[in-house]
Every structure is written in C-alpha cells, then in structure tokens.
Amino acid sequence: NIGFDVGVTKVPLVCQSCIFDLPVGDVFTRPDKAMAIKACENAELNEPKSGCVGGGTGATVGKILGAERCMKSGLGIACVKIGELKLGAVVVLNAFGDVFDTNGNRIAGLLNEDKTGFSSTEEEMYKSIQPKKQFNTNTTIGAIITNGKFDKTKLNKIASMTHNGYARSINPVHTMADGDSIYALSVGEIEADLNTVGTLSARVMSMAIENAIKSAESMYGLTAYKDLKF
C-alpha cells in the first residue's frame, strides 16, 4: 500500500519509463522473478515479437473520450540496413492521439460513437477551448539502436530527431496528456553521419509505430486494427 495513488492501485516510484495500463486486465497482476528470468532467456532466442506482448500487452490509443472508444495497440518493431549501417526501432504505443501509417492513412485511434468508423481526436479537442480533464495517463516509449559510432551527446540528438517519427505517425502528439520518450543506443561498430542516422531513425520509428498497430490483437473488449469492419 505504498506509492503514488493512480486510482485503481498504488505504484512505487522508481527511475523508469513505463506505460499506464492498469485499467486493462487484472490491476493486481505484477511481474515476478520467474517472469524476469524467462524474459532474459527469451532475449537470447533472437526471435523478436510484436503486438500484444511485453510492454504492449495493455497498450491502447485514441483515448480523448476514455476507454469506451479507444483501440488496442501494442509493441512495434522495425529495422533497416543501408550498406554497413544497421538501425532498429522498438516502441510501446500507448498514445493519447490517433495513429497513421507511413502513407498518412488513419489506421487506429478514436472510434465514432457506434464504432463504424473513425472520429478525429484533433477535431474533438477543438470543440472546446476551456481547460478540461482528459484521459492523461498516456505514454509512447521508443528506442533506437544502431551500430553507428556515436557518443552520448550525439545519441541525444538522434533521439531528439527520432521524435519526428512520432509526429508523422501520431496526432495529436507530445501533449500534456502524453509522456512521450525515446532512447538512443549505439554499439559503436562503424562510422556514420549523424544527420543521416537521425533522419533515418524517424522513418524507422514510424515503421515501428505502424507495426505496433497492425500486429496488435483485439482483447480486453478493445478492437484492434485487424478486426476493423470499415
């Protein structure tokens, strides 16, 4: 009974990045030692999975009107190789806004009242300019991993540039209802241009976001992209 009160339970405050998914599933379920060991074992299999696994299990998008009209999301992955340069992205998509594919098509987010199509989160926001209480426990967490050689300062810039991928794929994004974060890591194998890697990182992050939507499964009474009827 110790920690920050989030309504349905209390969460211990430690240094971390996490999504708020406690309204989905059993609020009292917690990771244990056996799950941690299994996660380490699975990491050695080199069989990356996406969708409603790991951090993506309880992820949702399009929550301006609450859980009743949002959609199921998940964990997304994407990777590219240009010459010797390798770059991968992973994202847990738990966004306040709507989601678009790399061609600009809306693929997930706020559903209309009878759930026969999409509504626009942005347009819903414009119905009133007065301060309002919104579903503000949203976070999209991503990471970029590259074999390019970069120090901490340059990786910070790459992470910053990668947020362009969020902006292309999520709207609205970076709101006060979001806790959007991106980490950048380097294994330091080859020389690479920072501007090129930063620009490419945004593109690959957009690909990972699309994957998070298209690989998710309907569950907990929430509809996923795969099961849309329109």
Segments (PLM) and residue ranges:
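A structural signal for small-residue-enriched, beta-sheet-centric alpha/beta enzyme cores
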Residues: 1-230
